[in-house]
Amino acid sequence: MGDIIEGTKPTLDDLWAGDEDQKPQTPPVSPPRSPSFKHEHKSPFPGSTSPPPASPIGEEDLKPRTARASSSTSKVKSRKASPEEFKPVLIDDLPTAWDEAHETFEALEKCVYERKDIGLSKENDEMMVCECVYNRHDPDADPCGPDSDCINRALYIECIAGECRAGKHCHNQQFSKRQYANVDVVLTEKKGYGLRASSTIPANTLIYEYIGEVVAEKTFRKRMQQYADEGIRHFYFMMLQKEEYIDATKKGGIGRFANHSCNPNCEVQKWVVGRRLRMGIFTKRDVIKGEEITFNYNVDRYGHDAQTCYCGEPNCVGTIGGKTQTDIGTMNDLFLDALGITDEVEAMGMKGSKKKKSRQLDEDFVPILRPISAHEVQKVAAAIRQSMENKKMMSRLLQRIQMTDDGAMHRQLMRMHGFSLMYMVLTELADDNEIVLLALESMNKWKLQIRNKIEDSKIEEPVKALSQSGDEKICGLAKQLIEYWSTLELSYKIPRVSKIASLDADDEAGTQTIAEANVVSAARRPDAWENTQEIQIDIAPVRPRTLPVSRPRPPPPPPPLPVKKPALNSMSSTDRLKLDAIIAMAEQTVQAQAAAAAVEATASPQAGSSRSGSRPAEDEERRKRQKRTHMTEEELAEQKERRLRKLIGAVVVKSMNKYKDMMEHDTFKKYARECTDTLVKKEKKRNPSYQDVKHPSLSDDKKAKIKSFTKDYTHKILKHLKEKGKLRNPKSSSSLRTNSNDPRQAASSSTNGDTPSISTTPSQGATQRLRDGELVDDIFGADEDMVMDLDEDTPEMQNDHPAPPSVPPATPPLPPVHVEVVDNVSTPTSQWET
């Protein structure tokens, strides 16, 4: 599969090792070391141990051997030793080390790529669809599950959400949904950090995805040298496919902590998820709680010495690394089953041990190949998809297909996307004439009734190219196939809405490059998750808005006291005091009225301005109502259709807005109108009664259908633009994007940059809705008639008269007046209590 190139971590080309029938036999684990050794995890191991010299090989083992036997059971099966019964040794006494382990690397949620054009799968769209259907009458149904007959699962292809006919009951979306097993990170004594099962894990379960930075060959070589210069001995490289590697040395997931074992309970598998190839660690058998998660590294050393193995298994070979893709000892069970040699390998002990070197395929072990039997078809098809970088393995698998003459097996191979697999072989390995010839000879035996599979798999393209080959035999077979396929008729099938068309756009939007990830991680560094700095913002006090209160003017200062005159008679003096009091009260009343008049005079210009400003608005409303009254039936129908168009257009624009940056603005408006017009025609045809509704609206169900149609429509547009080279590259991160053409945003940024203040702008969601509304008006035009009709429903607009002006609040009462009567004083003194 792939190769982990690391002192103790695997490359991916041949990460297939171990026997599914064997059970682990781990010796007791020593007590964990002290936490002071935490920086010594995966400590350097001693140098490589030279394997013992190979035993002499008989001449008969070097001769190619084939057999026409129908049974795949080896004659040596009777000599196969029965496996010992033993119980796996648990490591549940080891301490967990989540925090310490996470200090050694930077966690990633998913793989990031050096470029977006690497890490892509070579599968055709025809291979992405399975045949599983959910049966609601079967309570034990497990569509696309480990025990089902799902083609996708057999070929290590994940079903597409929304495309699989099992719907929400599909059990083959583990990578997309991140359905990882329950494991703990622990600190071992000799192997550094490791993974431990926190509960019982069934077979064929995804433990964790192998996550890291996907780099090209040149960068991989450069990093190997860089890490060596930095003194890093244990690299975490895994080969994804030819000239592409996953580097989890400094950035990745906890899958990097799974340790090596010569008798592992897990294996690494290469899966197709959408448009990408992804690696996952899967259980080979049931793993009990407390057992360590291990798999066979099969290290290609790339100039580094092999490491000492500490797995402690009875079949331990003593070292990690130095293995090749054809080494029987580390070959995955999938390839052994596909070649039909599992029993023979087990019986003869070809996997090797510390005392015995393992055999090499086609060097010191040439297997007897037999025609494919029914139970081997899925294994052979899956092994072909996994062997694109292993020409020796591919040649052996194609030999088995070529020697199979059973028509039932041919039909099963075609059902397992045989033509699409041959398309991959002829495009990826076109330089190997032996492999090309075997593929053409195999397909020449496959009989068809219709040519639909030929069209879906696109196999005719590479075969036509081979018809011009200089090799006469290859050229003749290619022409023979093309002539045969041309006689077949194409069967018509009812097309259905496919989610596969959206894979390219979804991959473009969901894939992140290393450069983009570095920008985001700089903005969201680990110490930025918590606010540790206090920000002081000075806010000016805000007075409550109240109406002005009339305050009486202070009284004039009292005049100087006159010269006291002799008192008059008592009767005239009392009358004079009463008269003075009456005069003083009258003057106070006059002053209060004058103050109230001044306040009213101050407020009157504002009221007049408000009344004068509302008059044009009232005239405009009256004009709209008159226009509404004199509209013809054709104009009314046109108006309602315009409303429906804008109502649907708002949902369309909102759905397409996600991909707005991937095309020109005018192009976006053009396709938004076309999509809306299509939906309006459908709605008018399905629901002619929309004209009877005064204020039409869309239900949630109808909005969901519009969004789904718009998404598929947009993806087709993006694919069309991409083919014409008019597709724009979206910005790396919307959060880091600045729109210099938006005056509102520029003004906001310039204002906020001066001094800290309380934000008065609307929320992000409100701003986005405002922009969507402006974009809808820009595309479909503003609808004044809709606003007019909505206003007609308000109580204020039920008659032709405007609403009465608001009455200002009454002037607050004057404060009480206390009058002090002074004898022989012509003018009294008044005091205002506040």
UniProtKB/Swiss-Prot annotation:
GO terms for biological process: methylation; regulation of DNA-templated transcription. Residues 1-83, 531-568, 601-638, 680-703, 720-818 are annotated as: Disordered. Keywords: Chromosome, Methyltransferase, Nucleus, Repressor, S-adenosyl-L-methionine, Transcription, Transcription regulation, Transferase. Residues 604-613, 730-767 have a biased composition (Polar residues). Belongs to the class V-like SAM-binding methyltransferase superfamily. Histone-lysine methyltransferase family. SET2 subfamily. Disulfide bonds: none annotated. Its EC number is 2.1.1.359. Residues 181-298 form the SET domain. It catalyses: L-lysyl(36)-[histone H3] + 3 S-adenosyl-L-methionine = N(6),N(6),N(6)-trimethyl-L-lysyl(36)-[histone H3] + 3 S-adenosyl-L-homocysteine + 3 H(+). It is found in: Nucleus; Chromosome. It comes from Cryptococcus neoformans var. neoformans serotype D (strain B-3501A) (Filobasidiella neoformans). It comes from the Eukaryota. PANTHER family: SET DOMAIN PROTEINS. Residues 541-550 have a biased composition (Low complexity). Histone methyltransferase that trimethylates histone H3 'Lys-36' forming H3K36me3. Involved in transcription elongation as well as in transcription repression. This is Histone-lysine N-methyltransferase, H3 lysine-36 specific. Residues 125-179 form the AWS domain. The lineage of its organism: Eukaryota, Fungi, Dikarya, Basidiomycota, Agaricomycotina. GO terms for molecular function: histone H3K36 trimethyltransferase activity. GO terms for cellular component: chromosome; nucleus.
